[in-house]
């Protein structure tokens, strides 16, 4: 810049000596050196025209005007008789822009910053701007602790006054904090204060938040944390006097010194509220109540201000101002808080608009709204609409924007901006275990059918042991009040023996219809009716199965496997869901509780009841919700009525990707104990362990799972940011470390009758596993990978360390 001023000054001086003060009439204007810039464009930028009388000041203005276009790096104005001769040197045109050595800053971000400064391909090159960019980038590296970093712009000339621009980065290494000193602290130790910092001079291995790499922004955040720490404990006159950041000679070490004045502790003596309270003084006063003698607390003061704003926001005052001014009395060490409130204007909603819903119909989104058009703006109602859209599970993100209507003092438009995700999935599952080998499963599910909000599923399984098909449809808004209607039909041909379960075949089909009744924003009750026909055959005699048949008045021979039995059952189905998750998929905060159950009704062959309770709670441990603790439980119980038992084919099972990972699906819990209907079969069957009595085969233990009428499963997960994933895909990929445990038991098992066999009525036989899981919302649907190692198991359990599913998340 200084060179430019010197050049202009020298030109002005030379012009003065050439032209003199008397001026002359310009008869013609000629340019020399123009290449890219048209003559007409150059003439338009000049204040001098043909026929004008010009003097030294006009020439100076002409030079300044041509420089101001940004097209020239040198301008000279000469007189040739009555002709004005303008000699220019155009700035070169940027032909290409490349980067080298930048690891901390992505190319796209650099291009955006360059374009914001006017540096882009096809534009002229301003070397002064380049110098500013170099300095700005180096300042950025300094702010993140890389003090040895350098950025150089390399300009390579090309034909036709073009150049290649290359930014060469030498990022260096981040300076590490050697020591943090706090001077002036008496009430709290330095270790206690630093323990709340992100920046540390020592970071234990278990601390995933602390960092020894210096960053200016993090230091500013830590200083604010320090200030809040004192203000929250009554130190109303706390002050950070100064902060020194010292660099070691090799620029690899940082010493930080923070000088503070603690002051004394102060107690609140009272709160006085004044201003325009919009008629809500009583409610506001409730928010400002304090306990006598309570210590001054800065965080509580801020929360009080926010609560007042939220209160007024619920009544349509969209832009209230709340300011708290502490009046400190040093004599008695008290603080009186004066709160000034200006509610401002009450705003009404003109329109509610939706953006980004290319697939979902407006009506699907609009029916989730609690804010009405024409009513006053309620911030809580707008937020409820956002929560409900998130819980639909149709969108990756939902954002709200309140836009004032131009020309109106009291109207706004509420805009919901959504980013849709794939709501259809092709469900395909693969599992591999040391004992189970490979297993497959498939199906199709669409949660937002043609953008209507209907859920439609066509699921099927075909493998060595099962042929299953199901068609399900749910209309979440069967009535305008939000009553849902769902139904399904299914067919199942199940060969339990081939699934490593107890030996039997069950061919079943049925249907059910369910109504859902919303109670409030978070609770829904469900009720419905169902019918199922079960046709049992090839039942190999085993204790739990024969016990059930006996309760049904059936006493087949234990010496024959060719037994058959069929039932027709009608059920009353019920359920309750409490859902306060922050979004429908990949939640980060909130709780979901789901209770489902059924009980047979008159006209049924069986008489039993069955219920399952699922819970999931997400607790974020950071403000960005990237680190989350997830706790899950599942409890199930069922039993017979009127002296009958619950059918064995309705038993609960555990093991697999949705319960206890690391175990093969459905293999945790009681195992079949067979009657020796044909002893010679067992001699060649390694799965059976038959006892003998008086030289004859007695009962035979096996590894075939039979499930139980009671189940308990729990899981603790630590959800973490996925490494090596860009921010663009952060909302689509989830990584977690987990600890699963679970057990299944049979409350009707008589351990005294079967001494010498495992006590399958004992609920304390808990299995445990630990591992890592990766979930990805892919274009095909949710993909789930998990690897788990069982570390507590029992005889007969079957491990399946690696499991992979498409279409299943939790």
From Swiss-Prot:
GO biological process assignments: Gram-negative-bacterium-type cell outer membrane assembly; protein insertion into membrane
Keyword Signal tagged: yes
GO-annotated cellular components: Bam protein complex
Signal peptide: 1-20
InterPro entries to which the protein is assigned, alphabetical: Bac_surfAg_D15, BamA/TamA_POTRA, D15-like, OM_assembly_BamA, POTRA
UniProt keyword Transmembrane, yes or no: yes
Record keywords: Cell outer membrane, Membrane, Repeat, Signal, Transmembrane, Transmembrane beta strand
Source organism, top-level taxon: Bacteria
Domain POTRA stretches: 24-91, 92-172, 175-263, 266-344, 347-421
Localization per Swiss-Prot or TrEMBL: Cell outer membrane
Oligomeric and partner information: Part of the Bam complex, which is composed of the outer membrane protein BamA, and four lipoproteins BamB, BamC, BamD and BamE.
Family: Belongs to the BamA family.
Function: Part of the outer membrane protein assembly complex, which is involved in assembly and insertion of beta-barrel proteins into the outer membrane. Constitutes, with BamD, the core component of the assembly machinery.
Protein name per its UniProtKB record: Outer membrane protein assembly factor BamA
Organism the protein comes from: Salmonella newport (strain SL254)
